[in-house]
């Protein structure tokens, strides 16, 4: 992002307004999952842009997706087997392994990760980017998305849906997110503002299914929010 393309005048105006009008909020410690106004704004955005009918209380905010990945490993468990896409985001494998979790890289086909490949290994959690796979750009069709949801619903499994780069399209609207069509509370949705605003703005978020959010509040409420 070039400096001349960033709306610094608008950014400065909003900062001045916030400092002037939200002084008490700025001096109040954020809850573990993040400040309520930001979570509400994200919920409104996802409802409008991604058709996700969610509560702000399901949203967890963190300083970068790497931090949120580590939270998920703490929440779901280091004893689980995590599968990632091959090819894919190389840093993911290191994050899982450095946090003591078993990570398997599964080859993808022309529609993304397949249930056929998943059935060849023992796997508890898959981590995928169905709306814009990196580095191939593959978009997982709706039929494959339902197959993956069926896989997750068949056992104690989860899908981590990284909705990377979905804001940028030449025409039309994106295919519905896995989270928005999931009926079994098995999808964890993740996104970040580093692409839509700037890479130096380290604000990312995840949306947890309600049962998993309850577990998050019980297990990880001692942590401080990394975004203030």
Which ranges hold each PLM region?
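Short, histidine-centered active-site or binding-site loop motifs used for metal coordination
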Residues: 1, 129-132, 194, 220
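Conserved N-terminal helix/loop that builds the PLP phosphate-binding region
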Residues: 1-22
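Short catalytic/ligand-binding loop motif for oxyanion handling, primarily in non-cytosolic enzymes
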Residues: 3-7, 134-136, 167-168, 199
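Short glycine/proline-enriched turns and hinge-like loops at secondary-structure junctions
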Residues: 7-8, 170-172, 181, 199-201, ...
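Conserved core of the PLP fold type I
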Residues: 15-156, 166-168, 173-181, 188
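Walker B catalytic acidic pair
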Residues: 162-163
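PLP-dependent aminotransferase class I/II
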Residues: 188-228
């Amino acid at each position: 992002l070039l400096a001349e393309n960033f709306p610094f005048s608008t950014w400065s105006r909003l900062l001045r307004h916030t400092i002037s009008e939200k002084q008490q909020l700025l001096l109040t410690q954020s809850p573990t999952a993040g400040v309520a106004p930001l979570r509400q704004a994200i919920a409104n955005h996802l409802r409008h842009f991604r058709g996700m009918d969610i509560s702000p209380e399901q949203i967890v905010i963190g300083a970068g997706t790497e931090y949120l990945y580590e939270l998920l490993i703490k929440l779901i468990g280091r004893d689980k087997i995590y599968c990632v896409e091959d090819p894919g985001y190389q840093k993911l494998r290191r994050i899982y392994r450095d946090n003591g979790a078993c990570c398997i890289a599964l080859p993808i086909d022309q529609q993304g990760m397949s249930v056929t490949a998943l059935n060849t290994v023992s796997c508890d959690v898959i981590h995928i980017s169905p709306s814009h796979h990196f580095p191939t750009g593959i978009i997982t069709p709706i039929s494959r998305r339902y197959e993956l949801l069926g896989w997750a619903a068949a056992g104690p499994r989860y899908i981590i849906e990284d909705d990377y780069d979905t804001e940028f399209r030449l025409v039309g609207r994106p295919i519905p997110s896995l989270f928005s069509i999931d009926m079994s509370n098995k999808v964890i949705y993740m996104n970040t503002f580093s692409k839509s605003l700037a890479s130096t703005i380290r604000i990312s978020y995840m949306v947890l299914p309600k049962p998993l959010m309850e577990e998050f509040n019980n297990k990880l409420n001692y942590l401080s929010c990394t975004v203030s």
